[in-house]
Amino acid sequence: MATTSNQNVEFVRTGYGKNMVKVLHIRREGNHHHIIELIANVQLTLKTRKDYLTGDNSDIIPTDTVKNTVHALAKLKGIKSIESFALDICEHFLTAFNHVTRVKVNIDEVPWKRLEKNGVEHNHAFIHCPEALRFCEAEQYLSKTPVVHSGLKDMKVLKTTQTGFEGFLRDRFTTLTDAKDRFFCTSVYARWRYNTINVAFDAAWKAVKDTVIQKFAGPYDRGEYSPSVQKTLYDTQLLVLDRIPEVEEIEIIMPNQHYFVIDMTKIGLSNKDEVYLPLDNPSGNITGTVCRKPRARM
């Protein structure tokens, strides 16, 4: 059997790190407490590859050290937002070690929400409220400006009217009929890239989330008609770019999760669009990514 010589191959990329590093940070302002709980994945790339080539581990920062560093930085720096903390991690490894050339940090935030009653916030009690999961990614190369993405996922929204789907292409396999009025249910995934790191990250994330909900639902008293998932997705992206100048590019994925009227004629009932069958699959999957044209950038 022929063997491949190392003279005939080259590295495309290398990296290692620690995944699923969990931490919860409490910031106390007297009796009023603030918390952020997160799960971080940290990956490092080193200047040399002697660990791969010869088994020389002398440059390797142990992944246990990576975990300890995340915990230590939470203590030393605090956590203002998951994005700012990801940047702190990147900066630490690139400045503390002269042989680290790249750091990539992915963070998911655990969705704790402060308890509130009649407009009064609780000082120190929270409820797990996963209406939309927040995540981010920061990547930085040695002597380069970091690139930051933020995102939301698993935000499930539904409306029972003000949406349709008509005028689509038909061929001999098409059985779908035009729908002037239908359900629209989706689990939104959105990921956007900033053109600067000088961002009020919490406010920007909330603005994107609120914009997605606004374009999906429309005005509360009458809604807003959607002729397709594609149109709603694109209109949402345009409004995000208009409202948040720090966002350079945004990807949105909206799977079309179907609900069908249940045929009850066989049991002697007339179902006039009142009882539906939710179908998890198959589902449509609509995606789009837009960015600012060069002349439109800040």
From Swiss-Prot:
Q: Which domain of life is it from?
A: Eukaryota
Name of the top EC class for this enzyme:
oxidoreductase
Mechanisms controlling activity: Competitively inhibited by xanthine.
Membrane-spanning parts: none
State if Cell wall biogenesis/degradation is listed as a keyword. no
| Principal localisation | other
List GO molecular-function terms, semicolon-separated. Answer: urate oxidase activity
Task: List ligand-binding residues for urate.
Answer: T63, D64, F165, R182, V229, Q230, N256
Reaction catalysed by this enzyme: urate + O2 + H2O = 5-hydroxyisourate + H2O2
Span(s) of short sequence motif Microbody targeting signal = 296-298
Q: In which pathway does it act?
A: Purine metabolism; urate degradation; (S)-allantoin from urate: step 1/3
Family as reported in the entry's similarity comment = Belongs to the uricase family.
What does the annotation say about its assembly with partners?
A: Homotetramer; dimer of dimers.
Biological role: Catalyzes the oxidation of uric acid to 5-hydroxyisourate, which is further processed to form (S)-allantoin.
Q: What is this protein called?
A: Uricase
